[in-house]
C-alpha cells in the first residue's frame, strides 16, 4: 500500500476541522440525551424490543446496548423478564433521574416528555 503523499509544508487536518468542513448532513452530531436515556426511552415505548433494534435506532453497537441494559438493571431502573426466547422489560417510572440537577424529576417525566407526547 503506497503512503499518502503530502507537501512538506502542509499540516495534517484534524478530525474536528475535517468534520466541520463536511456538509451539515455528514457532520457527526450530538444530542441532549445520553445513550442510556435513549435506550431507556425505547424500552419504555416497546417493552419487548430486541437489542439489535435498540442498537440500530440509537446508533450504537449491540454490545454497548447490553452494557447500558446492565447499568439500568443494576440501578433498578428496569427489570428483565424472560418470555420464551425473548426478553420483556419493565421500566420503574417512579424512580428519580440520576443527576443532581434533574433528581427532583422522575423517570416518568422524561418518558412522558419524549415517548408519551
What residues fall within each predicted segment?
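Pre-recognition alpha-helix immediately N-terminal to the DNA-recognition helix
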Residues: 37-42
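Key DNA-contact positions within bacterial/archaeal DNA-binding proteins
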Residues: 63
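Central "turn" residue of the DNA-binding helix-turn-helix
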Residues: 47-48, 59
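Amphipathic alpha-helical dimerization/coiled-coil segments
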Residues: 2-24, 96-117
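Short, cationic-aromatic polyanion-contact patches
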Residues: 25-36, 50, 82-105
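Alpha-helical residues within the helix-turn-helix
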Residues: 56, 73-74
